[in-house]
């Protein structure tokens, strides 16, 4: 689900670095880019299209608000899902696949299962992002800051860390209910920086759950709490 917008952001930064393009580079958004019946604060703000927006703002929409139209606009700009998939695999993270756009998945709900990752692969990718110089620092700093300001999923990984002296950057993913009434996905991945300089990455995925959405988020929050207490010896 929308966790893959983190993967997309890394591939985008690599592409822009090679093209020597600034985050202020602007794209023209047409009305047909703003699909109806999908989650899109971008469309809600500019329903008629016909405007320019820079890459930085589009990343804010995808990483902070999980905007589906902004995601597909960026896919089109950077060369499609295959480009993202190949880039992530080139980093040695191969237990994942990104083959469908947001619009693909909204046209056919079953396609969402074709975009997948193991939790370990997602956590490894977070560690690679934190520790390695994948692309120019300005892109890394921007993605890092944007993830720490994520507005979605405050009841998941973040919940047990509120009030703690930590910095957390994360990206959520939320699926609809399938024909069986199960929530297809309730996900959250993130990195946590501790005040003593240590850090860890965490990925928690709840798949095809018959629990309500609030309970699925609580499961993620409980695991986040347990990991934090283990790492900090509490």
Protein language model regions, located:
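Structured C-terminal helix/loop/strand segments within mature extracytoplasmic catalytic/sensor domains
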Residues: 76-77, 81, 124, 128-156, ...
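Short amphipathic alpha-helical face segments that pack within enzyme cores
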Residues: 6-11, 121-124, 222
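Active-site SXXK
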Residues: 1-27, 62, 202
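Mid-domain, small-residue-enriched loop/turn segments at the edges of structured enzyme/sensor domains
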Residues: 51, 72-134
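Extracytoplasmic
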Residues: 1-3, 22-24, 93, 163, ...
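Active-site-proximal beta-strand/loop segments in catalytic clefts of secreted hydrolases
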Residues: 30-32, 63-66, 77-78, 100-101, ...
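Conserved catalytic neighborhood of penicillin-recognizing serine enzymes
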Residues: 34-73, 81
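Short, well-structured active-site flanking segments
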Residues: 14-34, 81, 136-140
């Amino acid at each position: 689900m929308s966790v893959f917008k983190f993967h997309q952001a890394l591939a985008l930064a690599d592409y822009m670095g090679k093209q020597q393009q600034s985050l202020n580079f602007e794209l023209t958004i047409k009305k047909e880019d703003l699909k109806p019946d999908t989650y899109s604060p971008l469309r809600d703000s500019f329903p008629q299209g016909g405007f320019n927006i820079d890459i930085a703002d589009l990343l804010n929409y995808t990483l902070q608000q999980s905007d589906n139209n902004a995601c597909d606009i960026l896919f089109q700009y950077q060369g499609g899902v295959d480009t993202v998939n190949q880039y992530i695999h080139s980093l040695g993270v191969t237990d994942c696949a990104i083959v469908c756009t947001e619009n693909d998945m909204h046209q056919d709900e079953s396609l969402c299962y074709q975009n997948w990752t193991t939790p370990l692969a997602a956590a490894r990718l977070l560690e690679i992002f934190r520790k390695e110089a994948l692309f120019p620092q300005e892109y890394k700093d921007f993605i890092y800051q944007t993830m720490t300001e994520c507005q979605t999923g405050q009841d998941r990984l973040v919940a047990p860390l509120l009030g703690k002296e930590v910095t957390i950057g994360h990206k959520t993913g939320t699926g609809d209910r399938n024909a069986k009434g199960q929530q297809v996905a309730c996900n959250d991945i993130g990195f946590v920086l501790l005040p003593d300089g240590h850090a860890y990455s965490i990925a928690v995925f709840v798949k095809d759950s018959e629990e309500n959405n609030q309970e699925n988020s609580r499961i993620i929050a409980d695991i986040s709490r347990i990991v934090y207490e283990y790492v900090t010896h509490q």
